[in-house]
C-alpha cells in the first residue's frame, strides 16, 4: 500500500512538471510569435516607406543665387499669368469667415527699376456685386530651390525649380465706402528657364501652395473700423478649395465645384464676363 502511494505521488509530480514545462514552452512560443509579428509589421512599414517616392526638399539658395533670381529674372509674368491672357489674370478666392467667393484681377504688375525685390500692382476686386480698384506692392523676401527628380531629360531648358515667399499690401481707394487694405503673404512655385523666362511648376503638391502655383494668404482690414476678415486666393483654386471648404470639389475625372456652395458665389464660376472692364462685354 505504501509503495502504491509513493508511485501515485511520483506520477502526480511528473504530470505537474510536464504541465509547467508545456506552459513555459507555450509562453515562450507566444512571446516569440509576438516578437516575430512585431518585426514583420516593422519590416512591412520599412518596405512601404522605401517604396515611396523620395520627398521633394526645399534648400536655401546662396546669396549669389538669390541675387541672380531677383536681378536677372522678372516674375511679373507669373503674377499676371501672362501665358493665358486675358481671363487668367483673374484669381478666385475665399473671403470672410463664411468663405464667400472673391475675385482679384491684376491689371498691371511691374518690377521696380531700383529694387529687384519690389513689384508694383494695380487691379480690381469683385466681392458679390461690389467692384473696387486697388493698388499696392509685393515684396519678395526669400527664395528657395527644390531638390527634386521631377526634372526629366526632356526638360533640358529648365535651370531649376524654385519657390519664393514674400509679403503683399494692396490698398483700396480710401474715399470709397467700406474700403480697406489687403495684406499678408504670397508664395510662388516656378521654374527658371535657360532663356531667362519663368513659368509655373505644375508638378508640386507640397508646402503652402498645394499645387496652386501662386497663393496670396492674409486678411482684409477696414480703414474705418480696423476690423479684419481672412482672405486667400490662388491661381488654381481647385488645389486649395478642399482645405477651405469641406468637399469643395466633387468628381474624379470631371472635377467641378460642389453645388452646395453655389450660395457662396460659386454658381457662376464658368461665366465669361469681363467684369474688370469699364464697359464689360462677354468674352469669346
Locations of the language-model features?
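Short coil-to-beta-strand transition motifs
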Residues: 129-133
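Sec-dependent N-terminal signal peptides
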Residues: 2-9
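Bacterial signal peptide processing site
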Residues: 16-18
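C-terminal motif of bacterial Sec signal peptides marking the signal peptidase cleavage site
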Residues: 11-14
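Low-complexity, Pro/Thr/Ser/Glu-rich flexible segments characteristic
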Residues: 20-46
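Charged, amphipathic alpha-helical segments
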Residues: 71-72, 98-106, 137-155, 177-205
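Tryptophan-anchored aromatic micro-motifs
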Residues: 42-107, 117, 121-125, 157-178, ...
